[in-house]
Amino acid sequence: MALEDLFRNVTKRFNDDTTAEHEPMFKCPRCQQSVPESQFQEQGKVCPNCNYHARLTAAERLRITADKNSFVEYDAGMHSADPLHFPDYAQKIERSQTQTGMRDAVITGECTIKGSRTVLIIMDSHFMMASMGSVVGEKITRAFETATEKGLPVVAFTASGGARMQEGILSLMQMAKTSGAVARHSEAGLLYLTVMADPTTGGVTASF
């Protein structure tokens, strides 16, 4: 082996080792094993050692569910108000919007999944635990109504801590509203599939 080839191989091994040492690692909270962050992300945030599933953001779930560039969002500009002037509610909404880049805890829209047109509903627990307030209830109701009108199936990824207490009775009203929209969709003979993600609790479980 030529001397320059020897140095080239040594340099390559050094660079590979350096890259591995500096790559961000994910430590699984279940098995405590560390895996490269890139590998963890490529596998949909699933631990390759113990099959632990980390919580996904709405954007991450959309990326692995809908066909590429097929998603058209509904009601993108809708956002929560503070009708009861609940202490610190406006600040919590603003903080969640900054942290997640979302207007509220759910995104709805139309896409194709393996080529099939579908209305998609995705809740994001990173936004105030995806609690169901007026905006969440209204967007879900409108999504079902649009799907019923167009004769499309609905796929919903639920992940919610329940009703949003800062909106009081207005939050509880969303249970009846969404349930009614689901019932009308079912009466039309259309498909509705719920994927219950972590966490799915309380009024969301009872409503849709």
Predicted feature descriptions by range:
Residues 201-205:
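Acidic, divalent-metal-coordinating active-site segment for phosphoryl/phosphodiester hydrolysis
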Residues 1-193, 199:
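Terminal-region recognition feature
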Residues 208:
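C-terminal binding/interaction regions
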